[in-house]
Amino acid sequence: MMTDSMRLVWEKAKEAIRSQVPDQGYLMWIDPLRVVKAAADSVVLGCPNPLAKKWLMDHYRGLLESAMQQAAQRPLKVLLEVAECVAEAPETPEEAPQQLCLPAFADIPRPSSGRLLNRDFTFDSFVVGDCNDFAYSAALSVASKRSKLHAPLYLLAQTGLGKSHLSQAVGRQVMQESPEERVFYITAEDFTNEMIGALNTGTISSFKEKYRRNCDTLILEDVHFLSGKNRTQDELAFTLDSLMETNKRLVFTSAYLPSEIPKMHDSMRSRLNAGVISSLEAPDFRMRMRILQRKANSAKIALPMDVAEFMASELTGDIRHLESGIKGLAARNSIMGRGIDLKMAREVVGNIVRNRKALTLGVITKMVCKYYRVTEEDLRSRSRKQAIARPRQVAMYLGRRYTDQSLQAIGRTFNRYHATALHAVGVVERHIRENGDMREPVLFLCGKIEAGEF
C-alpha cells in the first residue's frame, strides 16, 4: 500500500535528519513522528500533540520536507496533523490538514550552488517603509533582467532587520526570471570552508573555475566572517575581480560597514566599498504596525487595532520581536481558545520585554554558566576546549543580541579581542540557521531571556 511504502521512505528520511540535528532534539521531536496518510504527491506525519506540531512548524519545517523529498526522489508535500494513536489510514487524505510547505518541490527555485533559499523571503512578502525603501529598490534593481545597476550591492543591517530576506529575494527573482542563470547563495564561512577543502584535496583549480567562470549571481552572506582570514580574502578578491569584469550580479550582507570589519585587507575592503552600500534601519511605529498586520495575516489570526497599536508601541526592537509577539498571540488563541484582546497582548509582550533593562552581560554570563555547568573563570580563561569555547561563544552572541555592549566590550569581558567576539556571533548565527547542535541551547536561553526568567 502507498502508506506502507511511504513509511519506508520516512525511515530513510529520519536517518538523514538524525545526522543534522542534536540527539536530544531528534529524540524529542523527530522520532515520535509517524506516517499516518500518504498519496502519490503528499505525506501526512502524525504528531503526538499540538505543541509538538507547532514546534516542528517553527523549527524543522524545511528540514522535514527536504529530507522526505530526497528520500522519495520526487516532489512531495509534507503535512502535519495531531494523531496521538497512529493507525492504518486511507491512502488519500479525506480532509487536508495544515500544509507544511505550500509549493511542490519542483516549484521551489534552487541555487546552482550553496544553500537553499527560504521560500518566504520574496520581494512581495517584504514590508517596505522609510527605514528600508532604498535597500529594497536597490535589491529589486539588481535582480531585474533589465537592470542597469552593475555595481555590487552591500546590504548593511543588524540582526533581524531584513538583509537576508532581501538578499534571498534577489536570488529567487533571478532564478524565476532567468532559470538558465547560475545563482550561488553562500555565507563567507561556506566560501572559506570550501576553499580550504579544495586546497587540502588539490582541487583549487576547480574551485576557482567554479566561482570565476560558472557563476552568474553570487550572494555572499556575513562577509564580516572574513575578518583575519587572509588566504580567503586573497582568493575572494580575485574572484570578485573576475565577476565584476563580466558584470555579474554581486550581493553582500553584513552587520558592519567594510571599514568597521577588523583585520580586513585594504584591497578586499576597497572591493566591498566599490558598490552600493544600503542600510536597513529599525522600523518606526507605522512600519511596525504594517509588519504586525502582515504577520497576523500569515498566522491566520485577526489582530484588533488596539492590540496592534499596543504591540507596535512596546516591541521596538528588531522584527523578530514582532514575530515573537504574533506567535505568542497565535499560540494562546489556539491552545487556550481565548479571543485576542489587550489583556492577552500584555501577557505576550510582558514575556518578551520583562526586565529587559535589568539584563546585563554579567547576568547573561551567569545564565550561560548555569546552563552549561561551567564557571565564569572558565569563560574568561584561555582554554579552547569545546566544553569551554562553546559556552563562551553563546555568551558573546547573547550579549551582542540582548545588550547594547559593543563587540570590543564583549570581547574584553572574556579576555578576547573584538575579532574573536565577531567570530563567535557568526558561529552561533550559523548554528541557528543550519539546525546545528548549538541551536536548541541558544533558543532555550533566548526564550528564558525573552520571558524575563533570568
Curated annotation (Swiss-Prot):
The keyword Membrane does not apply. Its main location: cytoplasm. InterPro entries: Chromosome_initiator_DnaA, Chromosome_initiator_DnaA-like, DnaA_C, DnaA_dom, DnaA_N_dom, DnaA_N_sf, P-loop_NTPase, Trp_repressor/repl_initiator. GO terms for molecular function: ATP binding; DNA replication origin binding; lipid binding. Keywords: ATP-binding, Cytoplasm, DNA replication, DNA-binding, Lipid-binding, Nucleotide-binding. The keyword Hydrolase does not apply. Residues 116-333 are annotated as: Domain III, AAA+ region. Signal peptide: none annotated. Plays an essential role in the initiation and regulation of chromosomal replication. ATP-DnaA binds to the origin of replication (oriC) to initiate formation of the DNA replication initiation complex once per cell cycle. Binds the DnaA box (a 9 base pair repeat at the origin) and separates the double-stranded (ds)DNA. Forms a right-handed helical filament on oriC DNA; dsDNA binds to the exterior of the filament while single-stranded (ss)DNA is stabiized in the filament's interior. Oligomerizes as a right-handed, spiral filament on DNA at oriC. This is Chromosomal replication initiator protein DnaA. The lineage of its organism: Bacteria, Pseudomonadati, Thermodesulfobacteriota, Desulfobacteria, Desulfobacterales. The gene is dnaA.
